[in-house]
């Protein structure tokens, strides 16, 4: 048994287990819409939503920003070093139990501090992984995914797999090797690649082709090593257009899918899509989900929301019912997320510094997605949008439209058709009517 040196305290002693009390409840620490065992669309809400807590924002973030110092008040921050790492594990599993969430996710450097050498760092990681494994064995919480932090340490100033320095590439490979071993040890259902610094700031000093080729080589090495050790989790890659680099290589869903297919990686990887990253890319979240879904590569979701008035990754907790409804609509149309889930890659605001704010924030996000699930299920069940779309594209189900779809038409036949049918009649797209219907479903379901 791994012993902590924190005398094991109750980090959330003021909070009872958060329970479902229904929409009329005024209890801020009760679910109004998230009822884990309620069946929606043939599955329980718990299985449809597969909520996950993000270790980094919840247990390591301190509220520091470019303009000010830390603000967060955390009971575990009385410790440091490995004692702090152990206290965070205790606090994490207490929070998981309080919220009754089935999953969590972490970067390697979230859970254990770096040592003076890679060997020492790995030893620190081993201690905490063993501790986490013991907590997992006595709870119902599973690891949704883990990943490697290859962006914080100054060695990654020029990137990791896309670094101009081969020594850095080698170090990054060693770090992901350990990450995959951790994934297998803890039974992670997925392993994520987020290229924090996999991009460039100026082409004046960048060999773009070599960097892309090396990134693909790196990912193929990861696939090969996972096969070697028998790790069978789903590989995921998370797009982001900018920040911290000016041009990230995995800009958005379409760009990332193109990269995966170009290098023969699409049979191994799916996409982990974040709402705020969609905002930064100039897309709606549902756009990114749809692009991945129609390509069969929608894997998991980082559930948050951005501020369209700001140009950076604000990672707010998701409370926008329009966004959660349309996101769940895409997920339901996808048949769910498989081994993926809804991971709250979200942080409380800098001014929400009290420890209980972590609970309020997660309750808000879980309720928002539960509500979105119920509305989306009703929209799918009633075929609200499908019927409109089928009618809108009905000209491709017969006549010249069917010939186009079946590959029987060519420019010669289409020209002759256009000569004979000079009067073109379009129909209204009824966008405002559809938005009104969406409002009605959100308000009434």
Curated annotation (Swiss-Prot):
Chemical reaction(s) catalysed: alpha-D-xylose = alpha-D-xylulofuranose
Listed EC numbers: 5.3.1.5
CC annotations in GO: cytoplasm
Keyword DNA repair (UniProt): no
CC cofactor note: Binds 2 magnesium ions per subunit.
UniProt keyword Hydrolase, yes or no: no
Residues that bind Mg(2+) 2: 274, 277, 313, 315
Active-site residues, Swiss-Prot/TrEMBL: 107, 110
Positions annotated to bind Mg(2+) 1: 238, 274, 302, 345
Location of this chain's protein in the cell: Cytoplasm
GO molecular function: magnesium ion binding; xylose isomerase activity
Domain of life: Bacteria
Keywords, in A-Z order: Carbohydrate metabolism, Cytoplasm, Isomerase, Magnesium, Metal-binding, Xylose metabolism
Family matches, as PANTHER family: PTHR48408, XYLOSE ISOMERASE (PTHR48408:SF1)
HAMAP family hit by this protein: Xylose_isom_A
Annotated family: Belongs to the xylose isomerase family.
NCBIfam families in UniProt: PRK05474.1, xylose_isom_A
Quaternary assembly: Homotetramer.
Stated name of the protein: Xylose isomerase
Species this protein is from: Priestia megaterium (strain DSM 319 / IMG 1521)
Gene: xylA
């Amino acid at each position: 048994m791994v012993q902590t040196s924190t005398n094991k305290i109750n980090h959330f002693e003021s909070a009872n287990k958060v329970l479902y009390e229904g929409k009329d409840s005024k209890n801020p620490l009760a679910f109004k819409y998230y009822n884990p065992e309620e069946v929606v669309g043939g599955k329980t809400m718990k299985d449809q939503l597969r909520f996950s807590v993000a270790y980094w924002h919840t247990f390591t973030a301190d509220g520091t920003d470019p303009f000010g110092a830390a603000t967060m008040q955390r009971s575990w921050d009385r410790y440091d070093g490995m004692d702090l790492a152990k206290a965070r594990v205790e606090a994490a599993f207490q929070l998981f139990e309080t919220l009754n969430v089935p999953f969590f996710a972490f970067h390697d450097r979230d859970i254990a501090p770096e040592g003076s050498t890679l060997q020492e760092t790995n030893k620190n990681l081993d201690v905490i992984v063993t501790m986490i494994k013991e907590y997992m064995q006595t709870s119902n919480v599973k690891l949704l995914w883990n990943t490697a932090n290859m962006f914080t340490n100054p060695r990654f100033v020029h990137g990791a797999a896309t670094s101009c320095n081969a020594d850095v590439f080698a170090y990054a490979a060693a770090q992901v090797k350990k990450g995959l071993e951790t994934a297998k040890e803890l039974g992670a259902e997925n392993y994520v690649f987020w290229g924090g610094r996999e991009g460039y700031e100026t082409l004046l000093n960048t060999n773009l082709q070599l960097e892309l080729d090396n990134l693909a080589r790196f990912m193929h090495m990861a696939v090969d090593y996972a096969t070697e050790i028998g790790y069978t989790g789903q590989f995921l890659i998370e797009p982001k257009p900018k920040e911290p680099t000016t041009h990230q290589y995995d800009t958005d869903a379409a760009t990332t899918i193109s990269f995966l297919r170009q290098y023969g990686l699409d049979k191994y990887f799916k996409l982990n899509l974040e709402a705020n990253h969609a905002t930064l890319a100039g897309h709606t979240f549902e756009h990114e989900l749809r692009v991945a879904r129609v390509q069969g590569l929608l894997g998991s979701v980082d559930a948050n929301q951005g501020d369209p008035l700001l140009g950076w990754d604000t990672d707010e907790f998701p409370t926008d019912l329009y966004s959660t409804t349309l996101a769940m609509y895409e997920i339901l149309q996808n048949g769910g997320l498989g081994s993926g889930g809804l991971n709250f890659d979200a942080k409380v605001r800098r001014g929400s510094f009290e420890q209980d704010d972590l609970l309020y924030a997660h309750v808000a996000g879980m309720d928002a997605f539960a509500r979105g699930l119920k509305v989306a299920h009703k929209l799918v069940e009633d075929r609200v949008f499908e019927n409109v779309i089928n009618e809108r594209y009905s000209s491709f189900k017969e006549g010249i439209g069917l010939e186009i779809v079946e590959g029987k038409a060519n420019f010669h036949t289409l020209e002759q058709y256009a000569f004979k049918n000079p009067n073109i009649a379009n129909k209204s797209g009824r966008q405002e009517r559809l938005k009104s219907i969406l409002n009605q479903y959100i308000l009434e379901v």
